[in-house]
Amino acid sequence: MTEVQSSVIEGWSIESTLPKKSEVEKLAELVPAGTEVYLSTLPHVSLDQQIETAHIVRVNGLEPVLHVAARYFATRTELVGYLARAGRETAAENMLIIGGDADRPNGEFDSALSLIKSGLLSDYGIRRIGVAGYPDGHPKISSDALIEALGAKIETAQAAGIAPHITTQFCFEAAPILAWLKDIRERWPDVPVKIGIAGPTGFKTLLKFAVRCGVNTPRTGIAQKLTMASKIAKTFSPGDLLDDLDTGLGQIGGGNLSAHFFSFGGLEKTATWIAGRLNEKSNFTGTNETQRMQL
């Protein structure tokens, strides 16, 4: 029987878009070597910029995980060149494969699944891939369609000898995450899941990203909740959400769950907060163990 984790912060990763060299160097001082740094892509971010940033992450002893947006590639040749360069300059073995925000595909790849099906990932040394999960749903795609697409991506990757994991959109409440995880664990009990969580961030900044990423929906009522919370504190903190998730882990069972932090408030600020959280957990565990031994 798989041991249940004590906290989702175990094995955490962090995400940014185009962090500066100085920001990456500072991050490397704060976090363990080999920490995964996901590098997101947007329409205004060039492939050159993304790979150059991944190279900086790699030479600083961290593990870059490139977001690869299928719809951004105009030709198969362009994708081949990108994968070859990623392997050559960043030693990439792990990527997050997404469809991308473009309304229309620039070429033959219209979805993450079509790119995974191409067979090019394993040809260029990719051994692990992340695929997107949406515990809070998607504003344009039904829940049934999301699950069907997720299953197809997982099965296609596994058939190609690539180990898949699920990286989710960031969420604000534990209940929908735990309900979604329960369903995922029943379908794919051994597939690792990275739970998207916003790091410490100003409420105005957080709301901007929530709207941009489709997290702010009428059903979730996030805009109203963030507005109310901003009257109590200046900065959003994910501590309560992590506490609620840790409490709910026993209901789901199994391991292979970890937090994936979106560093909307900056890499250094997020990493510093994580270090503090880990220190708190360590002290709490140590205190409980001491008390147990004295009984």
Regions from the language model: what does each represent?
Residues 107-108, 141-143, 178-179, 204-212, ...:
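Short, well-ordered secondary-structure micro-motifs
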Residues 66, 153, 162, 195, ...:
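Conserved, mostly hydrophobic/aromatic
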Residues 140-159, 163-185:
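Hydrophobic, aromatic-enriched interface-forming segments
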Residues 16, 42, 71, 142, ...:
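Glycine- and other small-residue-rich loops at beta-strand/loop junctions that grip anionic moieties
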Residues 15-20, 98, 111-136, 149, ...:
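Active-site pocket-lining/capping segments in soluble small-molecule metabolic enzymes
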Residues 2-150, 155, 266, 276:
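Active-site beta->alpha loop and helix N-cap motifs at the rims of alpha/beta catalytic domains
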Residues 49-50, 76-79, 175-182, 206-207, ...:
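A short acidic (Asp/Glu
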Residues 261-269:
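A short, acidic, flexible beta-alpha connecting loop/helix-capping segment that sits on the rim
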